[in-house]
C-alpha cells in the first residue's frame, strides 16, 4: 500500500493525543495528517477508511483483463555456450567476445566506457560474416574493439540522431535580441 495518503486535514500530535475520536470524526475522508515539530509524523485513519483503502489495493492488485500473454514473448531462450574454435575461423552468428572484453580492449588501447551492445555486436558479426575472412578469436575481439570505438566516436561521442524524429523550433529569444 502507498505510504502517502493525501488529505487536507492536518493536526498536531498533542491535539490527537488529547481526543483522537473527535479528531477522526471531524475529518473529511476519514484520514488526518499528524504533525510533530512542524513536520509530518504519520497519518491517523479511521477503520472504515482503512477498509476502503485495503479493498482498493486488493482490486488494483488483480489485472483488469483476462488476456494472458504467452511467456515466450517475454523470455529470451537460453543460448547454449559455444566453445571458441581453435586456430583461425570465419565469423559465425553465435560468436561472442570474452567476458572480460572491456578490460582486454583497454589493454589494446581502446577504452570502452560501456559494454558492447547487442546491436553493435550484431552489426559487426553481419559485416564480417559477409566478408568471409578468417582470424583468430583474439583478432576478432581486437577488430570488434576498434569497430565499436570508431562507430561511437564518429558522432563526437553524442548518440546518433533519430532520423524519424521531427525537429521542433526553439521559441526562446536570447537576451539582447528582439522578438
UniProtKB/Swiss-Prot annotation:
Pfam families assigned to the protein according to its UniProt record, in alphabetical order: DnaT
Keyword Nucleotide-binding on entry: no
The keyword Zinc-finger is annotated on this UniProt entry: no
Swiss-Prot/TrEMBL GO biological process terms: DNA replication, synthesis of primer
Superkingdom per UniProt: Bacteria
Family label: Belongs to the DnaT family.
HAMAP family documented for this protein: DnaT
UniProt name for this protein: Replication restart protein DnaT
Organism listed in the record: Salmonella arizonae (strain ATCC BAA-731 / CDC346-86 / RSK2980)
Gene symbol of the encoding locus: dnaT
Amino acid at each position: 500500500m502507498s505510504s502517502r495518503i493525501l488529505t487536507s486535514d492536518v493536526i498536531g500530535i498533542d491535539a490527537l493525543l488529547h481526543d483522537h475520536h473527535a479528531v477522526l470524526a471531524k475529518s473529511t475522508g476519514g484520514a488526518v495528517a499528524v504533525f510533530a515539530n512542524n513536520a509530518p509524523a504519520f497519518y491517523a485513519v479511521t477503520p472504515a477508511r482503512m477498509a476502503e483503502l485495503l479493498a482498493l489495493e486488493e482490486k488494483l492488485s488483480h489485472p483488469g483483463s483476462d488476456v494472458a500473454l504467452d511467456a515466450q514473448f517475454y523470455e529470451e531462450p537460453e543460448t547454449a555456450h559455444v566453445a571458441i574454435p581453435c586456430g583461425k575461423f570465419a565469423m559465425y552468428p553465435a560468436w561472442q567476445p570474452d567476458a572480460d572484453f572491456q578490460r582486454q580492449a583497454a589493454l589494446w588501447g581502446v577504452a570502452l566506457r560501456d559494454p558492447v551492445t547487442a546491436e553493435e555486436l550484431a552489426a559487426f558479426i553481419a559485416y564480417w560474416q559477409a566478408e568471409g575472412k578468417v582470424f583468430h578469436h583474439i583478432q576478432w575481439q581486437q577488430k570488434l574493439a576498434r569497430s565499436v570505438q570508431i562507430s561511437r566516436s564518429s558522432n563526437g561521442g553524442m548518440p546518433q540522431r533519430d532520423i524519424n524524429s521531427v525537429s521542433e523550433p526553439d521559441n526562446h529569444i536570447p537576451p539582447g535580441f528582439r522578438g
